[in-house]
């Protein structure tokens, strides 16, 4: 029985500069990682080397990220290429096809979890996300304190508009998930439903816990917490990071760990920004998967320091 969570490194940091999946995973193993997450930038050409490395035991795969591998002809990360919230049947069919393919691949590499995005609400005119973005660009800290009354009024108005439009998108997302539950269960894969960073992405953070807890106990799903995304949403005034984690703790599967800089850039090295990782670590459990999801811009030292800082909190 494990006494500490698994700590993995995501290929988000390095897949772009590799042509051979074996060499990529060998590099990650040489940094001291027993486990790796195969992220949403895995090109088809990397797959043979990945399978060889997994078969030889170079690393183990803790999780993968939809879509993995990428659809044929797509050569860069594209997790929102097809969305489960879209009602147009051709895109829906593509989402379903490539999600099932990702489930197959996750099972093939013996991953436990496939991390998934749940779509978004689209606006043809008067997108409320634009008003939020513009205000925060000029008043960077307006969302954190709750003291900016003009921003609070804008936020309330924008949320009302978002909720008014979101129903068909959210209903489609739930229907899409229902289409893959049995398939994922048959393959032994749990779907990690990830919190997102954009204003109009689904589900709304305030609804996440009720949605997941309201699913059938047999549904192969759980909550996947991204620290950077939660911090960005906290900066918008949409959640309190600790309270959000506490509400979703009963169905937590794992974490994407990365920091956010003073200018709002995420996927930074752990401890380099303002996220309270000591607070986050209070929610870690031995059965959880912890994944460092770092930007390709991070240096080798950034990766090593992030690993050491997480291990010190475990």
Task: Identify the role of each PLM range.
Residues 34-40, 192-194, 291-293:
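Short catalytic-loop micro-motif centered on adjacent basic/acidic residues
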Residues 61-63, 193, 225, 292:
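Hydrophobic residues in well-ordered beta-strands that form the structural core
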Residues 67, 196-197, 228, 295:
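Catalytic metal-binding/acid-base residues of hydrolase active sites
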Residues 36, 81, 159, 166, ...:
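Residues at structural and domain junctions
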Residues 84-222:
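Active-site acidic/histidine proton-transfer and metal-coordination neighborhood
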Residues 1-111, 130-150, 168-170, 178, ...:
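N-terminal pre-domain/capping segments
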Residues 1-7, 11-29, 44, 55, ...:
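Histidine-acidic metal/acid-base catalytic patches
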């Amino acid at each position: 029985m494990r006494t500490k969570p698994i700590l993995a490194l995501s290929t988000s940091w390095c897949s772009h500069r590799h042509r051979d999946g074996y060499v990529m995973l060998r590099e990650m193993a040489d940094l001291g990682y027993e486990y790796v997450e195969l992220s949403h930038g895995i090109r088809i050409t990397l797959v043979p080397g990945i399978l060889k490395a997994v078969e030889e035991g170079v690393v183990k795969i803790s999780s993968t990220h939809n879509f993995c591998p990428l659809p044929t002809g797509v050569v860069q990360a594209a997790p929102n290429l097809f969305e489960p919230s879209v009602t147009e049947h051709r895109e829906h069919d593509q989402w379903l096809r490539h999600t099932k393919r990702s489930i197959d691949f996750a099972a093939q590499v013996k991953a436990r979890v496939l991390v998934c995005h749940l779509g978004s609400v689209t606006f043809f005119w008067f997108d409320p996300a634009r008003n939020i973005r513009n205000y925060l660009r000029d008043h960077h800290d307006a969302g954190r304190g709750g003291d900016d009354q003009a921003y609070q009024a804008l936020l309330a108005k924008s949320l009302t508009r978002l909720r008014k439009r979101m129903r068909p998108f959210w209903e489609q997302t739930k229907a899409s998930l229902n289409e893959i539950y049995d398939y994922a269960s048959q393959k032994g894969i749990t779907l990690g439903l990830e919190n997102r960073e954009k204003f109009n992405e689904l589900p709304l953070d305030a609804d996440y816990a009720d949605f997941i807890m309201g699913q059938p106990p047999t549904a192969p799903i759980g909550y996947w917490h991204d620290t950077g995304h939660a911090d960005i949403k906290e900066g918008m005034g949409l959640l309190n990071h600790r309270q959000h984690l506490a509400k979703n703790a009963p169905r937590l599967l794992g974490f994407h760990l990365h920091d956010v800089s003073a200018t709002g850039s995420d996927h930074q090295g752990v401890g380099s920004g303002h996220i309270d990782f000591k607070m986050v670590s209070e929610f870690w459990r031995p059965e959880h998967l912890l994944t460092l999801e770092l930007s390709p811009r991070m240096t080798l030292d950034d990766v090593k320091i992030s690993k050491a800082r997480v291990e010190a909190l475990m």
